[in-house]
């Protein structure tokens, strides 16, 4: 498989570059896998400590891009406490049969975030996979990040949000009919 790993909140243009890389491996008969982490307890949609997209919205975006699989790894002790080398061997190699990994330069994983891009590269020859590290995408000389997107949302800079995401931001929800006193 061709795998990219991360939180992917908002699926901004930086995330999209990673996904383009794994999608390009389809010509080598590799399935595209987005390995993401479930929401930490206590997080909600948008705002500080919250997500830009819901899980369902993220899944819809990935399907539209042509991603074969989205794996949402839960925040459970077995995963949180897993050593980085074990994560590579047990999850990436044995479960996902990884042949190609695309990540950003600051990707961290494993217990206490001890795993790094350097470790992924170091173990690549042993487990027979390729690692590609993509530089951060920029817009107007600023690094594109989910934090920056959230900041622009909070500031009401919707045109900039559109440029950062590459698609119009939207909010979805259920209309609740209150006491109808505002008529």
What are these regions (language model features)?
Residues 43-127:
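N-terminal Rossmann-like or analogous alpha/beta NTP/dinucleotide-binding catalytic cores
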Residues 29-33, 69, 130:
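Residues at the starts of beta-strands that form the adenosine-phosphate
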Residues 1, 35-38, 65-70, 96-99, ...:
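Generic detector of short, locally flexible boundary/turn motifs and exposed helical patches
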Residues 34, 72, 133-135:
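Structural signal for conserved beta-strand scaffold positions within catalytic alpha/beta enzyme cores
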């Amino acid at each position: 498989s061709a795998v990219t790993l991360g939180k992917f909140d908002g699926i901004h243009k930086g995330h999209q570059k990673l996904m383009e890389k794994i999608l390009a491996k389809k010509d080598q008969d590799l399935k595209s896998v987005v390995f993401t982490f479930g929401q930490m307890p206590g997080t909600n949609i948008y705002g500080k400590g919250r997500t830009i997209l819901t899980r369902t919205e993220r899944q819809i975006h990935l399907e539209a891009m042509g991603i074969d699989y989205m794996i949402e790894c839960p925040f459970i002790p077995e995963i949180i406490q897993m050593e980085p080398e074990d994560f590579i061997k047990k999850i990436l190699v044995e479960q996902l049969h990884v042949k190609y990994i695309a990540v950003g330069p600051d990707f961290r994983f494993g217990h206490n975030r001890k795993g790094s891009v350097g470790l992924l590269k170091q173990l690549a020859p042993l487990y027979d996979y390729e690692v590609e590290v993509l530089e951060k995408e920029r817009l107007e000389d600023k690094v594109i990040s989910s934090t920056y997107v959230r900041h622009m949302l909070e500031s009401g800079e919707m045109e900039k949000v559109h440029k950062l995401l590459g698609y119009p931001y939207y909010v979805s929800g259920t209309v609740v009919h209150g006491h109808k006193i505002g008529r």
